[in-house]
Amino acid sequence: DGKDNVVIICSIENFDPIGIHTGDSITVAPAQTLSDKEYQRMRDASIAIIREIGVDTGGSNIQFALNQHDGRMVVIEMNPRVSRSSSLASKATGFPIAKIAAKLAVGLSLDEIPNDITRETPASFEPTIDYVVTKFPRFAFEKFPAADPTLTTQMKSVGEVMSIGRTFKESLQKALRSLEIGSYGLENVPADMSLIKSRLKTPNAERVWFIAQALREGMSIREIYELTWIDPWFLQNLKQIVDMEKEIEGSKENIIFSLDPLNPGPLESLILRAKRYGFSDRRIAQLLDMQETDIRHLRRKNNIQAVYKIVDTCAAEFAAYTPYLYSTYEVPYYRVQGSKDLRIQGSNPRPLGPSTPVVDNEANPGNR
């Protein structure tokens, strides 16, 4: 602001290594693999850069690349404006960057602008995130068969989806089934090992599915890392999803048996863990060769229901008056007051367009 106050709204980490345009990479907020020391180095560098460039008021986004083997950090770019990353950061945190930037431009300072969600804290309070946001790019190579599907520094995605969960695994799987490409998770990819290794080595739109398939085929995280240079933390999370799939598939007899109301099986823990990993009822049904309605019936029978938590910029430290909600399978949960039920009709989710994120009804602040 005009008083030289600076706040960091959000840290966003790319799933893919350097060499792929940020708009074509899966991104995660907050950053998951940085140590506190690395984060503070980036924070200090960001503040120094924005001051050196001469941004009097408003927002900027600064991108870094970090070599975690030797600690070398370089600046990729600095955008002294509201950008696509600003839009993602606003949605991820509930902090209205464009609105605040406009007020700063007319002379207000950060400590003079109230937070509309808490009505207590000023804009100089940095947002706190107690959830994980995943942005997944949407490609349309099926409409352009002559286009090269290899991902490079030139952006090729036509849109993106954003999802929120308590963990990276949950938010990733939510994003996968929001793409409207017929995917409900990390489904099997029919491919031999040579094709799998080729798809791992060459960045492409389906690489996350091929990583999961490589894990199913017995490749180690180290082998996949050496082909993709994707941080092992992300690969370990994908392995946990694949391991959960195997556990579900290995429980077919128990699941089927538990559908008999006279002989219920002790499956609450397995189904609850699967839902916390972000598995949809349809994906669980695919793994068990069952109907989606059977899984939903089993869930409800065992009182495994989605609950709702709030995006309030402060991790529930203060009361929230205008937060928005996301679903998860965890307690405690946010209770919506009132006895009336509402039915929302409209065009949401919006269809994907050029660099347009999908907004689903559940995450829309107006649909509460």
Predicted regions mapped to residue ranges:
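ATP-dependent carboxylate activation and anion-phosphoryl transfer catalytic cores
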Residues: D1-E247, I256-F257, E268-L270, A274-G278, ...
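Intrinsically disordered, low-complexity proline-rich regions
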Residues: S251, S258-P266, Q337-S355
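Short alpha-helix boundary/capping motifs
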Residues: I129, K252-E253, I284, D312
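Extended, domain-scale alpha-helical bundle/helix-rich regions
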Residues: Y277, R283-L287
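Non-catalytic terminal/interface segments that mediate subunit docking, oligomerization
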Residues: R300-R335, T356-R368
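Short, basic interhelical loop/turn and adjoining N-cap
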Residues: L227-Q236, Q286-L298
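Short, basic, helix/turn surface patches
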Residues: P266-S269, Y321
